[in-house]
C-alpha cells in the first residue's frame, strides 16, 4: 500500500509525468536488447517504420540513369542525397511501381522453369478443393514429413554436384556425376537454362528445392504426403480441421506410395519361395517403379515402412533402429532388458516357448491410426496410455500392447489351439500366434484383464472391456488420452543383418522386422511397377502367368532350344516355370509331366519329328516332378478364368493359338510374341539349332578322329573339321565356320544336309 501511495504522489507532480512520457528510452538493458546482434528484434515494426519514411530503399547509383527523377504525377522517385555510409542512392517505394509499369521488359521464358515448384504449387492450390471446417479436438502427433512437393530424391551431396555442374559449369572442383538420375537431371536442366538471365544464386536455391527431399518433424493429424503438408496451416488448427483435396499429385508422393506397394508384394512373394532372401534380392534388382530401378529408389528414399525396410536391409542399407510388432513401430525410450526362453501354458494347455524380456522398459508405439506410451516390467504391463482416431484403432493398440507385455493373464485367455501359419504354410512364432489369435477376437482377453478404479487426471479417461469410456474405472493399467504420442524424431540409422527367412536383427540380435509384420493391405500403385522377375508374374492372376510363361519361352527361344536338346533337366528346373505349376490341376501334374517328357525324348531320338510350336506349347508342363505312367493325352488342362481350359497337344486352342502365316502366338487372345524361326521347317531337327555356326560337309571322314558328341563341338577352333555324332547314332563331318555372319542360314540348310549325308 505504501508503495502505491508513493507512486500516486509522484504522478501528481507534473514534472514526473513529463519525464516519463517525453524522455528517450536510454535504459542500458533495453538499448542492449534492441541493438545487440544482427537479428532484427521486431521485424514488423521495423518494416512499418521504414516504409513510413520517404526513401526506405537503397539502390545502385546506375538507377538514376534508368528511372526519371519524378513520375507522371510529379512525385519524387529518388533523392539526390546519398545513403549514409554507402555510395548508394535512396529510393522511394514509388520507384518500384514506376519500374514495374515502365521498366525494361525481359524474357520471362525461364521463370516457370526456374520457379517450377512455385508455379506447380499455385496450380495445385487452384485446382484443389477446400471443404467445410469442423471444430473438434485434434489428436496431432509429430511425424517426420516431407515438406517439399515435387522433388527428386538426390542426397545433398549428389544435388550439390548437379547444381554446380548446371549453374557454374566452368568452376574448378571435382564433381563426379555417377547416378543415372544425376546425369538425366543435369542434361535436362542445362538445356532448359540456356541464355537464362536469372541470378545464378537464385537458380541454385530453386534447383535445391527441386532435387532434395526436405523433411521436418511436424504435428500432423491427417494426411502426411507432401501435397497435404504444404497446406498444413490451412487444414488443421488446435481445435479445428478443414477438409481439403489436393488439386494435383507430385511424383515424390507417388514414388513413396508405389515403393511401399512394390516392397510389400515382393516381401510377400519372397516369403513363400524356397530361398526367401535370394528371391527378394532378385526381385528388387529386376523391378522398376515409374521407369526407375527399384534398388536406386531404395538407396535414396527415406520412407520407413516394414516391407521397404526389409528390402533395404537385404541390400545392406542402414535402417531405423525401432522395431515393429503388430503393425506398430516400437521405440524404446528408457530402461533395458535381457532375453530368456521360457515355456508357458495357454488356457488350452498348449505349451508355448516364448522369449521373455526381463527388466523394466518404456516404449512409444506409433501406428497409422493410434499411438501409445507403454511402461512394462518382466511379463507385466504397468501402464499403457493410448490415443487413437476411433474405438477400433484404440482396441488394436491395446491388443498389441497386452500381447507384447507377455502377461500370464493374456496367455491364459487363449481359447482353442494356436495354429496360425504364414503364406509359406510355416507355423508363426509364438508371439505372432498370440497376436493373430487376439486380433481375431479379444473379448476374453479384455474380460480377464482386470479392472481398477481410477483417479481423475486431466486429459485422461478410463476404458472398459467393451471399449466404452469411463471416468470411474478402467482396465488395469490402461488409460485413453486426448493427446497423441509423437513419432520418434531421431532419424538415426543403424547397421542390421538379415537372415534367409527375411528376419532383420540389430547388432545385439534383437529382431526388428520379419515378414509377419508386413501389412496385407492391397493398394493400387500410382506409378507403373514393372516386375521383370518371373516370381511376380502371378501378381496379376493366372492369365498373366500363362501369357508371361510363353512370352519368356519365345523371347529366350535360342537358348531354350539348345538346352532342350542337350540338357533338358536343367531346363525343366528353371524357376521361370514355377508359377505355371499353380495353374495345372494338382492331381494330374505328375502324369502330364511324365507324358510330355516322354514325348520330348521321342522327338530327340527320332530325327525329323521336331516341332517347335509343340515344344513351346508343352514345355511348361514338363517342369513338374514326373510320374511314370502309360497314360496318353490329347489335351492338357490349365485352370484360368475360373475354370479348366484345354490346351490341345496337337493343334490350336483358344488358350494357345499359333498363326503359321504371321508366325504370331496368341495366348488367351493376348499377343505372346513372334517366333523368329519358322517352326514349319517342321522337321528341322534340334541338331540344326545346335549345329549353327558349323558347315556340314558330308559323311563321316575317319581322318578327323573319333566322333565327338554335340556338346564337345564348342571346343573346335574356327575352320577346324570334326566328325560329330547326331540323333540316332549317325555320324557326319562338320567344319566350324570362319565367319559368324552366315550362322543364320545354318539351321535351314543343316536339316537338308544331314539327310543327304546320312542317306
From Swiss-Prot:
One of its GO terms (cellular component) is virion component. InterPro entries: Flu_PB2_2nd, Flu_PB2_6th, Flu_PB2_C, Flu_PB2_CAP-bd, Flu_PB2_middle, Flu_PB2_N, INV_PB2, PB2_helical. Keywords: Cap snatching, Eukaryotic host gene expression shutoff by virus, Eukaryotic host transcription shutoff by virus, Host gene expression shutoff by virus, Host mitochondrion, Host nucleus, Host-virus interaction, Inhibition of host innate immune response by virus, Inhibition of host MAVS by virus, Inhibition of host RLR pathway by virus, Inhibition of host RNA polymerase II by virus, mRNA capping, mRNA processing, Viral immunoevasion, Viral transcription, Virion. Gene3D superfamilies: Polymerase Basic Protein 2, C-terminal domain. Transmembrane segments: none annotated. It is found in: Virion; Host nucleus; Host mitochondrion. Its main location: virion. It holds the Pfam family Flu_PB2_5th. A motif (Nuclear localization signal) lies at residues 736-739. One of its GO terms (biological process) is viral RNA genome replication. The record marks 627 as: Mammalian adaptation. GO terms for molecular function: RNA binding; RNA-directed RNA polymerase activity. Belongs to the influenza viruses PB2 family. Plays an essential role in transcription initiation and cap-stealing mechanism, in which cellular capped pre-mRNAs are used to generate primers for viral transcription. Recognizes and binds the 7-methylguanosine-containing cap of the target pre-RNA which is subsequently cleaved after 10-13 nucleotides by the viral protein PA. Plays a role in the initiation of the viral genome replication and modulates the activity of the ribonucleoprotein (RNP) complex. Influenza RNA polymerase is composed of three subunits: PB1, PB2 and PA. Interacts (via N-terminus) with PB1 (via C-terminus). Interacts with nucleoprotein NP (via N-terminus). Interacts (via N-terminus) with host MAVS (via N-terminus); this interaction inhibits host innate immune response. This is Polymerase basic protein 2. It comes from Influenza A virus (strain A/USA:Iowa/1943 H1N1). The lineage of its organism: Viruses, Riboviria, Orthornavirae, Negarnaviricota, Polyploviricotina. The gene is PB2.
